[in-house]
Amino acid sequence: MSDPQTHAGLIVPSVFYGLSEGSPAFAAVQALADQENVGHPLGPWFISDNLITFGHTRGFLADQHFVAAVLAARPTQAERSIAWRTHTLCWAAHSVASLPGDFVECGSYRGFSAEVLMHFTSGLPHRRFWLYDLFDPTGGPGEGSRLPDHSPALADQVRARFRAWDNVTVTQGKVPEVLAQAAPDRIAFLHIDMNNAEAEKGALEVLFERVSPGGLIIFDDYGWTGYRAQKEMADTFMQAHGLSILELPTGQGLVVKR
């Protein structure tokens, strides 16, 4: 997909999940998506990633710094569709700039979100970015769903993706066990996206106390109906620590560590 001139911004395709083709809901979404200028950064609509809004500025789609970071990571159509989620991560990265600690992502998959963050932060100076994933899950206990690009070769492909940066550590293995091999002592930014409540609970049990006061934790699956187990787990965990999770329209959950 070609983008408009730089003054316009990022075009977002209409991608939805969980709708049966031919159903009334599918037809309704398709009718909206077929309107003129849907997906255009200066238009009134955002119709993608199971989110429909009208009349919101969505200024991030015309933010040239953000747009450049996304395009530098060579997004697929599916990755373009999650632009709002990706912007949330970039906002979080910017917000913790003055805090001590590294960046951590549990569930990196192809490495797209992490690469956008590396471009957005100009290479994440003076910090390390720790990426964890099975990369080739078998579907066993504590493992998320197998996705199209999962393969025995994916770990090396992700390492190659980050070869331009010497401050990115890509570790293959099951969370939380793999965290014993290599993990930072202090964290400013923690992104959790493993599609599995058991694994995400394990990550929190190991990493939560390492998050700096004021640090941010983002759960990718928190508000999605297909992942209620993760929401229930995260709510229980945070309530035990006197914290609550902000559910975002993107389906993400956001926590400020105190």
What are these regions (language model features)?
Residues 1-84, 96-99:
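Rossmann-like AdoMet
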Residues 7, 51-80, 90, 97-258:
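S-adenosylmethionine/decaboxylated-SAM
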Residues 85-92:
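A short, well-structured juxtamembrane/interface segment
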